[in-house]
């Protein structure tokens, strides 16, 4: 009976880890689509930062997959939804802030599932990733507010900037101040 209970608890944790992985897979595709579009619109600096955030999401997806495998599960490979394409620059950042806010809320719920089922390792994984998702939210919210408040003036300042992310393969959240 105790072994069956442990397996049931483990399955609940694997389920939330896989749901989180599917959310990350969608975020990767969404942010890379936006990266390409922002670069095409000549907002290189914004495109570069969104690409770095997508790289963070790739790392998160891999971390969730590794934990699923450690628990004896099979990592999912399908994203949790479809990419919203063709967004205008003034819509991208509020959209992404909402996506990150939803992710933070959901991951906090998933963290509780891990705690309730006695998996402190997965709980700590969610805590670490939530911290990075908060950094993403702060960036998207800040840029969205600048675009909202300053409009064309803010965007003109960024137009024509380079989208090169240089030799920074680490992502947005693991580099000092997203630089």
Short names for language-model regions:
Residues 1-179:
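Iron-associated oxidoreductase/ferritin-like identity signal
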């Amino acid at each position: 009976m105790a072994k069956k209970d442990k397996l049931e608890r483990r399955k609940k944790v694997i389920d939330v880890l896989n749901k989180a992985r599917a959310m990350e897979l969608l975020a990767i595709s969404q942010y890379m689509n936006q990266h390409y579009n922002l670069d095409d619109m000549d907002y290189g600096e914004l495109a570069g930062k969104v690409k770095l955030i997508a790289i963070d999401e790739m790392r998160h997806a891999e971390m969730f997959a590794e934990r699923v495998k450690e628990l004896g599960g099979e990592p999912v490979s399908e994203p949790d939804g479809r990419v919203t394409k063709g967004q205008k620059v003034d819509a991208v950042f509020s959209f992404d802030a909402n996506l990150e806010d939803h992710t933070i809320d959901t991951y906090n719920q998933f963290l509780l599932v891990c705690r309730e089922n006695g998996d402190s390792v997965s709980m700590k994984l969610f805590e670490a990733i939530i911290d990075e998702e908060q950094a993403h939210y702060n960036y998207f919210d800040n840029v969205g507010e600048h675009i909202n408040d300053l409009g064309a003036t803010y965007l003109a300042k960024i137009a024509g900037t380079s989208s090169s992310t240089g030799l920074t393969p680490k992502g947005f959240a693991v580099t000092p101040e997203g630089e």
